[in-house]
C-alpha cells in the first residue's frame, strides 16, 4: 500500500481522492463520523445490484451503504466534472464524508474540470466486505469497509472524446479500496474518515 498524509502531491491527490489509484488520503483532524456491477457512461449515474452476502449487523450494513454511496457519488463527478462545481460537490459529499476528505476531492477534480476531462466506461465491484465494528474511547463507532473493483473498462477522455494519457488520469486495472468509516457519538450516520487503496492483480473470491 502506498501511504501518504496531507498534503499529497497534486497528481497522487487527484487519483487518490477520486478513488482511482493506490494512495491513502488521511485527514489531519479528529472527527466530531459478493459481486456488484456498477455501470457508468459520461452522464449516467452508476447503479448497483447487490448479490447475497454473509449476514452482517446493522452497523456493518450502514457503513457499507455509505461507502458504496460515496463511490457512486465520485463516479457521478468523474463522469461530468463540469456539472459539479465546488458548491455542488460539497452538497453531494457532505452527508458521506468528513471535511478533509471533501477537500481532497475538490482538489483532485480541479485538474479534470480545468482540462475538460471526464470518465467513460464501466467498473465492476467484485468484492465488498465490512469489517467488525469497533467502539472507540470517545464514543465513536468505527468500521473498516473494503471494496475491490475491476476498472479495466474505464477511460478518461478530453472534451473532444480523445483518450487522455496524462498520469493524472490513469488508474490500475484492479483496485482494492479500504474505507475507515466512522460514526460519532451524537451522529446517526457513518461518514468516510480515511481512505486507502491498493493496486492488486485481481479481486479474489
Predicted regions and their residues:
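Bacterial N-terminal signal peptides that target proteins for export
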Residues: 1-12
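Expand to "…catalyze enediolate/carbanion chemistry for C-C bond making/breaking, isomerization
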Residues: 15
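C-terminal motif of bacterial Sec signal peptides marking the signal peptidase cleavage site
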Residues: 19-22
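Bacterial signal peptide processing site
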Residues: 24-27
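Post-signal peptide N-terminal segment of mature Sec-exported envelope proteins
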Residues: 32-58
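Core segments of small alpha/beta cavity-forming domains
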Residues: 48-121
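Surface-exposed, charged secondary-structure patches
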Residues: 114-160
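Short beta-strand edge/turn micro-motifs at domain boundaries
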Residues: 144, 153-155, 165-205
Amino acid at each position: 500500500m502506498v501511504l501518504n498524509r496531507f498534503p499529497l502531491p497534486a497528481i497522487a491527490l487527484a487519483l487518490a481522492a477520486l478513488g482511482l489509484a493506490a494512495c491513502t488520503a488521511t485527514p489531519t483532524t479528529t472527527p466530531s463520523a459478493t459481486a456488484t456491477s456498477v455501470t457508468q457512461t459520461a452522464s449516467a449515474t452508476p447503479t448497483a445490484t447487490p448479490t447475497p452476502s454473509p449476514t452482517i449487523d446493522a452497523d456493518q450494513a450502514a457503513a457499507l451503504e455509505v461507502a458504496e454511496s460515496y463511490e457512486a457519488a465520485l463516479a457521478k463527478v468523474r463522469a461530468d466534472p463540469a456539472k459539479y462545481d465546488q458548491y455542488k460537490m460539497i452538497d453531494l459529499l457532505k452527508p458521506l464524508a468528513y471535511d478533509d476528505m471533501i477537500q481532497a476531492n475538490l482538489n483532485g477534480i480541479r485538474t479534470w474540470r480545468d482540462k475538460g476531462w471526464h470518465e467513460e466506461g464501466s467498473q465492476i465491484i467484485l468484492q465488498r466486505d465490512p469489517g467488525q465494528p469497533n467502539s472507540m474511547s470517545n464514543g465513536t463507532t468505527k468500521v473498516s469497509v473494503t471494496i475491490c473493483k475491476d476498472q479495466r473498462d474505464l477511460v478518461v477522455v478530453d472534451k473532444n472524446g480523445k483518450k487522455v494519457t496524462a498520469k493524472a488520469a490513469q488508474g490500475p486495472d484492479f483496485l482494492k479500496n479500504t474505507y475507515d468509516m466512522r460514526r460519532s457519538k451524537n451522529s446517526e450516520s457513518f461518514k468516510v474518515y480515511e481512505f486507502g487503496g491498493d493496486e492488486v492483480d485481481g479481486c479474489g473470491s
